[in-house]
Curated annotation (Swiss-Prot):
Transmembrane segments: none
Protein name per UniProt: Large ribosomal subunit protein bL21
Known role: This protein binds to 23S rRNA in the presence of protein L20.
Subunit field text: Part of the 50S ribosomal subunit. Contacts protein L20.
Cross-referenced InterPro entries: bL21-like, bL21-like_sf, Ribosomal_bL21, Ribosomal_bL21_CS
A cellular component annotation (GO) from this entry: ribonucleoprotein complex
Keyword Chloroplast attributed: no
Record NCBIfam families: L21
Sample GO molecular function, one term: structural constituent of ribosome
Keywords (A to Z) from UniProt: Ribonucleoprotein, Ribosomal protein, RNA-binding, rRNA-binding
Keyword check for S-adenosyl-L-methionine: no
GO annotation, biological process: translation
Signal peptide: none
Amino acid sequence: MYAIVKAGGHQEKVEVGDVILVNRLDAKKGDTVEFPVSLVVDGDKVTLAAADLAKVSVKAEVVNDEAKGPKIDIQKYKNKTGVARRKGHRQKLTIVKITAIA
């Protein structure tokens, strides 16, 4: 059984026991969070109807609330003017472990 959930602005395919990275959530380590479900597949049975999906919930436990993504370098350069700028960015992430699809 797996589900497609909306987590941190993205959609993720999850099963029970999966550990996923999502954009920073307002939750502390050890907290339980619940994600809205877009699709559930259980063997040959596919659930898409909004009324049926309202009954389904995906629960996850926050493993790490202070993770960071990879460093991204941004460079800006203007020829012949001496203008150059270098900047970096690391996205703040939350690591969650899926505990239940019910």
